[in-house]
A protein has these predicted regions:
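Alpha-helical architecture feature
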Residues: 4-53, 64-72, 85-268
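Small-residue-rich, membrane-active alpha-helical segments
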Residues: 31, 75-76, 278, 297
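All-alpha helical catalytic cores of prenyl diphosphate-utilizing isoprenoid enzymes
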Residues: 60
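Low-complexity, glycine/alanine-rich, low-charge segments that are largely flexible
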Residues: 270-297
């Protein structure tokens, strides 16, 4: 609500300053996190986003643009709470490696999340002899989030193709500059093999490949993001660095000058107000005075 955002404004401004972003960007993240996952501790939300942005190539400006739609898709996919938020932040960082651009990564993630609980995906899994809804529900009851459970189910479908397994092994040791091409080749194989039968959307498929084949990195992103939210203050650390820059000190000086000027005007304003009221009264009582004053100006 507007009242909640108003209460969070100091934290929003602090997070924006610490990350070199705008208050509007962080307000969008705060609103989306609250609306979709019920996350009402904005300090924690901001710390997790800041940490994720520091660890990977999907930065705060990208989150402000992509998270509102992604968080809605994450909610529909069954991701919940701060652990679900951490999974989403980590997934974005992994997705950059296969997409090449942050916009592409964001779209791949949205499409993947939308596919997890879609009717057409459930129908495709049924053709493979797998009850998608039932399997995801059982996994959640055991404490496995839906993204992890979905990945395990897709693995069952694609594990039979030796070409995919060979490329998967190659991707683990390949330098980052070669990974995008490898993932593209994997996608071509996957589309013709089992995985293409349950993930027919190309962008969703690329999002999945990023998640599955960058799984170790995804896990590191997620655990680091969660840990710093519980024990650290990434926003505070950034703020410490920002506060030492010349531009920040200049902004503080200008703000202090403006504040001092405002305080001085607050003291003078009552006197100016009384003077204005007196002049207005004279002009009202003696109209010729106004003409004389105007002629003398």
């Amino acid at each position: 609500s507007p009242a909640e955002i108003a209460r969070a404004l100091p934290q929003i401004q602090r997070a924006a300053t610490a990350n070199g972003g705008s208050s509007e960007e962080f307000a969008k993240i705060a609103l989306a996190a609250k609306r979709n996952l019920g996350l009402d501790d904005f300090s924690r939300v901001a710390n997790m986003a800041t940490t994720a942005g520091q660890l990977g190539g999907f930065e705060i400006k990208d989150m402000a643009k992509g998270l509102p739609e992604q968080l809605a898709a994450a909610k529909n996919a069954g991701l919940t709470g701060y652990s679900g938020y951490a999974s989403l932040l980590a997934l974005n960082q992994a997705a950059v490696s296969t997409a090449g651009t942050t916009d592409g990564a964001s779209n791949n993630v949205v499409n993947l999340l939308n596919k997890i609980n879609s009717r057409d995906t459930a129908a495709d899994f049924k053709k493979q002899g797998i009850d998608l809804d039932g399997s995801l529900l059982k996994a959640q009851e055991k404490g496995t989030n839906t993204l992890e459970a979905f990945g395990n189910l897709v693995d069952r479908v694609v594990a039979k193709d030796p070409r995919y397994a060979a490329l998967k092994a190659k991707a683990k040791s390949a330098p980052e500059s070669e990974q995008k091409e490898i993932y593209s080749n994997m996608a071509q194989i996957a589309e013709g093999a089992g995985i293409g039968k349950v993930l027919q959307d190309r962008q969703a498929l690329m999002g999945f490949l990023a998640y599955r084949n960058q799984h170790e990195k995804y896990g590191q992103f997620g655990s680091s993001t969660t840990a710093i939210a519980n024990t650290g203050d990434s926003v505070g650390g950034n703020m410490e660095l920002v506060s030492q820059t010349a531009s920040f000190k200049s902004e503080v000086l200008n703000a202090n000058r403006a504040l001092a000027m405002q305080e001085a005007l607050d003291k003078v304003n009552p006197l100016l107000g009384s003077m204005a009221e007196g002049i207005t009264g004279l002009i009202r009582d003696y109209p010729t005075l106004a003409a004389a004053m105007e002629g003398g100006v």
